[in-house]
Structure formats: C-alpha cells, structure tokens
C-alpha cells in the first residue's frame, strides 16, 4: 500500500508540475495519500464540505486522500477522505482545481 501511494505521489507531482494545463483539462483521476500514525485506511465523512472547512480538515489531520474527476465537460467533482472515521466527504464541484504542495501534504486551491 505504501509503495503504491509513493508511486501515486511521484506521478502526481510530475503530472502537475510538468503538465499543469493537461492536468487541469483532462479526465485523468488524481490521488494523493498521506499515511496516518498507525491508522492507515481510515476515512471521515462531513456534511456539505466547503473550501474553508477543507483547509481546516487538512490542517487537523496527518492523513487524507484527495481524488478528482470530471462529472461533465464543465464541472469537476472532488472527494476528500480522512482518518477519523469510516466514511467519505465531498467538496463542492470546481471548474478548475489546482493542487499545491505545502508542509508535506497536498492542499487544493481554487
């Protein structure tokens, strides 16, 4: 699992930094995973997650999985999985999503 995560992280880094326009306008899925302290694979659910609460979630957790894919030609759906319990949380659709590296984790910016 950890090796797969490392490969995804490396591919994601190359994809976003070498081909930023392609990564924004293709339907290629994107996954980023941080390893929690002894609790790998746990997720969290929140109701109506907003961009502001997403930032707070990222700051408060050492583990999250971010994946996005196009719902249609103009919108993107983003899912956020975190380590506190066993459900899934959804971020509202963005027309453009950019992922930045900060303090060892990926953070979404509009």
Swiss-Prot record:
Q: Where are the transmembrane segments?
A: 18-34
Topology in the lipid bilayer is annotated as: Single-pass membrane protein
**Which keywords does this Swiss-Prot/TrEMBL entry list?**
Membrane, Transmembrane, Transmembrane helix
Reply yes or no: does the keyword Transmembrane helix apply: yes
Q: What happens when the gene is disrupted?
A: No increased sensitivity to hydroxyurea.
An example Gene Ontology cellular component term from the record? membrane
Mostly located where? membrane
Gene Ontology terms: biological process: DNA replication; double-strand break repair via nonhomologous end joining; homologous recombination; macroautophagy
- Annotated localization: Membrane
What is the official name of this protein in its record? Putative uncharacterized protein HUR1
Q: Which gene encodes it?
A: HUR1
